[in-house]
């Protein structure tokens, strides 16, 4: 992300996302009420009931920020607070897409915190990885990035029975097709890593073909009990895969969640969850790592949103680690039952000491 602070009070910043990961970073950083100046286009009347698409620069006070993973676009909407007078757009609603490479200027009345600016400036695309799970019944392929996982394919093998004379030939075709799809998606998403999972030797045959077709790709195999989407999710829980993909925050999040569950089974005093409780321990300087879903940052509940904002500022200012993940990611869905946010503590904090 390109970041330029344009005023001494750190109210105005100029930004340019340089990857899809940057777009997601914008999604979790922009807030309703921020004013965005951006070059966009809008239909305007030109007489005789006709309209024409005109390029213009608008200042928009945001009330909606939407990100759809793997589309390369972030959609922002709000009320126009400044625009060309001749088109009468002030006070009207406008929506536009922020794409990779788009420059935008963001104004925030209360200013930007040091932690927010640092997060934007240091945020780099962690890259992507493709993950496949294959057996004699199913083949699934997914792409994994810091902002989420997308299933690209989930198909049945439909192989003939073991006694069918054509089975060996059909298995070979199945392996060829699986390898081809992995190579195609690795190239399309510029993924340096491919993980191929499944039971038995079939995954090894696929991996060998992938490696021959794309020598620059780092290919790893991992044993799982099945193929298909269930096999992909099983692979993500393997420690060997976590090591390979440790740069991706969604996998890092799985590790934090597993550590949280391990700790809570032994001692409730070593972890915290829910926005209010996490804020209480953050004020004590007790938080080592906090994991939360992105939707909390834009919660319609003012108390929840303010508690989360303060907790994150405190944790980051005291050298703690903050991991923000999509609510619809595997780890994000599991976080819902804990109020959307959990924390690993540096030292035990008794329950009675956590009251705000």
Swiss-Prot record:
Where is this protein primarily located? cytoplasm
Per the UniProt entry, the Enzyme Commission number(s) are 3.1.-.-
Q: Does the keyword Cytoplasm apply?
A: yes
Which SUPFAM superfamilies did the record assign?
Answer: Dom34/Pelota N-terminal domain-like, L30e-like, Translational machinery components
The terms under GO molecular function for this entry are: endonuclease activity; metal ion binding
Pfam families cross-referenced by the UniProt entry: eRF1_1, eRF1_3
Q: Which cofactor does it need?
A: a divalent metal cation
Assigned keywords, A-Z: Cytoplasm, Endonuclease, Hydrolase, Metal-binding, Nuclease
From the Swiss-Prot or TrEMBL record, state where the protein is found. Cytoplasm
GO terms for biological process, alphabetical: nonfunctional rRNA decay; nuclear-transcribed mRNA catabolic process, no-go decay; nuclear-transcribed mRNA catabolic process, non-stop decay; ribosome disassembly; RNA surveillance
Keyword Hydrolase among UniProt keywords: yes
Record's SMART domains?
eRF1_1
Superkingdom of this protein's organism: Archaea
Q: InterPro entries, alphabetically?
A: eFR1_2_sf, eRF1_1_Pelota, eRF1_3, Pelota/DOM34_N, Pelota_arc, Ribosomal_eL30-like_sf, Transl-rel_pelota
Going by the record, the broad EC class of this enzyme is hydrolase
Q: Which GO terms describe its cellular component?
A: cytoplasm
State the similarity comment.
Belongs to the eukaryotic release factor 1 family. Pelota subfamily.
Describe its partners and assembly state. Answer: Monomer.
The free-text domain remark for this protein reads: The N-terminal domain has the RNA-binding Sm fold. It harbors the endoribonuclease activity.
* Function text: May function in recognizing stalled ribosomes, interact with stem-loop structures in stalled mRNA molecules, and effect endonucleolytic cleavage of the mRNA. May play a role in the release non-functional ribosomes and degradation of damaged mRNAs. Has endoribonuclease activity.
For this entry, the protein name equals Protein pelota homolog
Q: What is the lineage of its organism?
A: Archaea, Thermoproteota, Thermoprotei, Desulfurococcales, Desulfurococcaceae
